[in-house]
């Protein structure tokens, strides 16, 4: 049975933020190893609660056991991986320029230092990996920041169990009181109070464009504006090039049917737009894709709110002028279910109707029929920023259409060739972020240890005595980290 949690009051939030600030003053002085040990302890506790938390997560999200176990394992991996990166220290971007033999020059040493308390909003579609102990939380801890998590009300019980595991790990590793806090709040006011509190120094968010933009605007209206790192979804356009479509159109269609319906389409990297040039090859692709989608049964979505939004946005998209429905379930599906849906429209309709650009979160995709490559280019130039874009193309296709390839590259943070955008690898080379409205800051990623940098700022120390410097910048390099010394990357001591 789902447990109901009371929204945190303004007074409770104020107390939480004050404790978080006091924890920051202590935690920022903890060593990189201490941070890493804390994160590894959280990972261990998450493994310890696996048997207890998985059934709760399954009940709250309607996600299957295999998916839940896999996501929890990914969350554990993230904590260990980001902890290792924190300890290794290259993310600090330590820079040293010594005065040398010129007494008129200062000794300058720069590194990243933590921002302060970070508020993290749990995501609805990833109860582990993007929520209470997820990537934003792990990155903030690695950067030296305390974390205050606002649980997502759709899986509040899961979040509560995970929060208990973090608190235990904090106690076991001697972390300062207030290093982590967990609050509930289904109301808008709870989130607003957290963002607007003067001791909040950054926000991490994964969710809708409306939600992320609201937090971003609030943060900008503060007396002291703060960064909001919001990942707000994407339609992840796919561009079918002529030779590739002719050679492998049927296989590509089958591959994309699986991608569109994976997890009932509830991934921020779900391919919601597919562009191709009109002709027999595109029609054959469309026919195979439609046939494959019709084989996929409706399934329960994460929670009633997401299901309701899917049906409303789906209906709005399908009722637009010049939109042809290719696949849609007959009659009414159960209220909580998402049904595989495919539509098509001309590029002219896409260019003239902003509704066709909008994300329909769920198992939905829209095929855009272009007259030729030039019209496809025009469509690209009128497409908003994305997390991913995909080129289904041969090498010859790429060489014949360089302007189109360049334009697609400008859209996104991750450019995929001959693959699917669903599936986000946790590694240093991953970029999970893109131009607005995909995210509020395309310079950063929310996946991979480079995401640690979101919650830190550069600090330069000028003419400090060596023993007064942070260990990371001292002459002997006692931590053995990589540093750029007088413009040369090295691990050596000065």
Where are these regions (language model features)?
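N-terminal Rossmann-like NAD(P)+-binding subdomain of aldehyde/semialdehyde dehydrogenases
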Residues: 1-106
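Short loop-to-beta-strand entry elements in the cores of soluble alpha/beta enzymes
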Residues: 38, 143-158, 179, 224-244, ...
């Amino acid at each position: 049975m789902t447990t109901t949690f009371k929204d945190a009051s303004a007074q409770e939030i104020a107390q939480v933020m004050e404790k978080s600030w006091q924890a920051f003053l202590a935690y920022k002085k903890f060593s990189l190893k201490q941070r890493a040990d804390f994160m590894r302890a959280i990972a261990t506790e998450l493994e310890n609660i696996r048997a207890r938390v998985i059934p709760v997560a399954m009940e709250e999200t309607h996600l299957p056991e295999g998916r839940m176990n896999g996501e929890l394992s990914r969350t554990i991996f993230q904590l260990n991986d980001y902890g290792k990166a924190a300890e290794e220290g290259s993310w600090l971007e330590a820079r040293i320029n010594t005065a040398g033999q010129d007494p008129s020059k200062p000794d300058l040493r720069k590194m990243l230092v933590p921002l302060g308390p970070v508020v993290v909003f749990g995501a609805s579609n990833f109860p582990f990996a993007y929520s209470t102990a997820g990537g934003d939380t792990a990155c903030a801890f690695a950067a030296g920041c305390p974390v205050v998590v606002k649980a997502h009300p759709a899986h509040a019980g899961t979040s509560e169990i995970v929060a208990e595991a973090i608190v235990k790990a904090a106690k076991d590793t001697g972390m300062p009181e207030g290093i982590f806090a967990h609050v509930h709040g289904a109301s808008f006011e709870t989130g607003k109070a957290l963002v607007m509190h003067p001791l909040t120094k950054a926000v991490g968010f994964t969710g809708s464009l409306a939600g992320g933009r609201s937090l971003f605007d609030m943060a900008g209206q503060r007396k002291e504006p703060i960064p909001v790192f919001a990942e707000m979804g994407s339609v992840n356009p796919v561009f079918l090039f002529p030779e590739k479509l002719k050679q492998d159109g049927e296989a590509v269609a089958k591959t994309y049917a699986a991608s569109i319906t994976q997890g009932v389409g509830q991934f921020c990297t779900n391919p919601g737009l597919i562009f191709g040039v009109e002709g027999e090859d595109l029609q054959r692709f469309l026919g195979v894709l439609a046939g494959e989608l019709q084989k996929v049964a409706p399934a329960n979505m994460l929670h009633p709110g997401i299901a309701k939004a899917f049906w409303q946005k789906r209906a709005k998209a399908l009722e637009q002028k010049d939109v042809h429905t290719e696949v849609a379930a007959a009659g009414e599906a159960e209220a909580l279910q998402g049904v595989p849906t495919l539509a098509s429209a001309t590029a002219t309709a896409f260019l003239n109707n902003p509704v066709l650009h909008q994300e329909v979160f769920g198992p939905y995709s829209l095929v855009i029929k272009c007259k030729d490559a030039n019209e496809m280019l025009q469509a690209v130039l009128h497409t908003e920023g994305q997390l991913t874009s995909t080129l289904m193309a041969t090498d010859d296709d790429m060489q014949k259409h360089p302007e189109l390839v360049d334009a697609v590259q400008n859209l996104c943070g991750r450019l995929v060739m001959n693959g699917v955008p669903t599936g986000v690898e946790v590694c240093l080379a991953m970029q999970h972020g893109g131009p607005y409205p995909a995210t509020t800051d395309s310079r950063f990623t929310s996946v991979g240890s480079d995401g640690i940098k979101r919650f830190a700022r550069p600090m330069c120390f000028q003419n400090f005595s060596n023993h007064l410097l942070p260990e990371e910048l001292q002459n002997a390099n006692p931590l053995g980290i990589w540093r750029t010394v007088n413009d040369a990357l090295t691990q050596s001591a000065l």
